[in-house]
């Protein structure tokens, strides 16, 4: 069994080897992906992939705590990051209160917060109170309404400069790593080179310090929509449907159960 990652080992990976981060929402999948992942992200994406909602905004703190504990049961040797859901860190006091609640009631090793310079003060406040924080810059799913949709960042020089400012502000605030999402590859590479902490990409090219994907996307289980940045490593939906049809057919023809399945 591989040694569990720590804040220190995550930071030291910068420039040595890319970090592998995968999302999980339950014990079953957490157990399956643990051997391959350096870190498991319990993302608020569960509101879409698991709960079937249209976006992440209605995910609650209670949901995140519940699923973080489920993941921890299945992946006892993994570094687990819990997403802080929309509306739980709008100011210093609420952010600290809600972060403490997650730490006290779940097995999270760290929390992830969306935002750049605008969230640096809150991140600093959390870090100074013993909360490990992973940042998240670029395309921010929790801000899709105010942004007018999910828009790729880094297309203009102004956006490039702001992304670098965001990354440096998060690093200075005390974050141990950050996710960069939906950013032009060349700009994401510049952002990663501008800071000393790992920058983990999703839809941000290969020249960053690691990658993260949603497990149901990469396994081909989510059929409704596949983002451009997702590679399907398995046609999971087709395989599952085929297996379920075989089961249904065998039940209807009484081919199942056979003697070996009977007491």
Swiss-Prot record:
Catalytic activity: 3-methyl-2-oxobutanoate + (6R)-5,10-methylene-5,6,7,8-tetrahydrofolate + H2O = 2-dehydropantoate + (6S)-5,6,7,8-tetrahydrofolate
Localisation: Cytoplasm
Active site residues of this protein: 181
Binding site for Mg(2+): 44, 83, 114
Signal peptide: none
InterPro entries noted in UniProt: Pantoate_hydroxy_MeTrfase (IPR003700), Pyrv/PenolPyrv_kinase-like_dom (IPR015813), Pyrv_kinase-like_dom_sf (IPR040442)
GO biological process assignments: pantothenate biosynthetic process
GO cellular component: cytoplasm
Family: Belongs to the PanB family.
Function in brief: Catalyzes the reversible reaction in which hydroxymethyl group from 5,10-methylenetetrahydrofolate is transferred onto alpha-ketoisovalerate to form ketopantoate.
HAMAP family: PanB
Annotated protein name in UniProt: 3-methyl-2-oxobutanoate hydroxymethyltransferase
Organism: Sulfurimonas denitrificans (strain ATCC 33889 / DSM 1251)
């Amino acid at each position: 069994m591989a040694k569990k990652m720590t804040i220190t080992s995550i930071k030291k990976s910068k420039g040595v080897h890319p970090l592998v981060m995968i999302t999980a929402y339950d014990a079953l999948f957490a157990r399956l992906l643990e051997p391959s992942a350096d870190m498991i992200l319990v993302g608020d994406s569960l509101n879409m992939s698991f709960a079937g909602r249209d976006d992440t905004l209605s995910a609650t703190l209670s949901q995140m705590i519940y699923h973080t504990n489920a993941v921890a049961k299945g992946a006892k040797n993994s570094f687990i990051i819990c997403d802080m859901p929309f509306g739980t860190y709008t100011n210093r006091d609420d952010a600290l209160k809600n972060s403490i609640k997650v730490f006290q009631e779940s097995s999270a090793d760290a929390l992830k917060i969306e935002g750049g310079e605008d969230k640096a003060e809150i991140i600093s406040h959390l870090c100074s109170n013993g909360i490990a924080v992973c940042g998240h810059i670029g395309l921010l799913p929790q801000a899709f309404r105010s942004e007018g949709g999910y828009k790729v960042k880094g297309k203009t020089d102004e956006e490039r400069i702001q992304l670098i400012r965001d990354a440096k502000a998060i690093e200075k605030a005390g974050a141990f790593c950050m996710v960069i999402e939906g950013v032009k590859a060349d700009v994401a590479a510049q952002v990663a080179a501008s800071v000393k902490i790992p920058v983990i990409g999703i839809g941000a090219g290969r020249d960053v310090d690691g990658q993260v994907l949603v497990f149901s996307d990469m396994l081909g289980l989510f059929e409704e929509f596949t983002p451009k940045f997702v590679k399907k490593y398995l046609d999971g939906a087709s395989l599952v449907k085929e297996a379920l049809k075989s089961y249904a057919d065998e039940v209807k023809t009484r081919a199942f159960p056979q003697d070996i399945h009977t007491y």
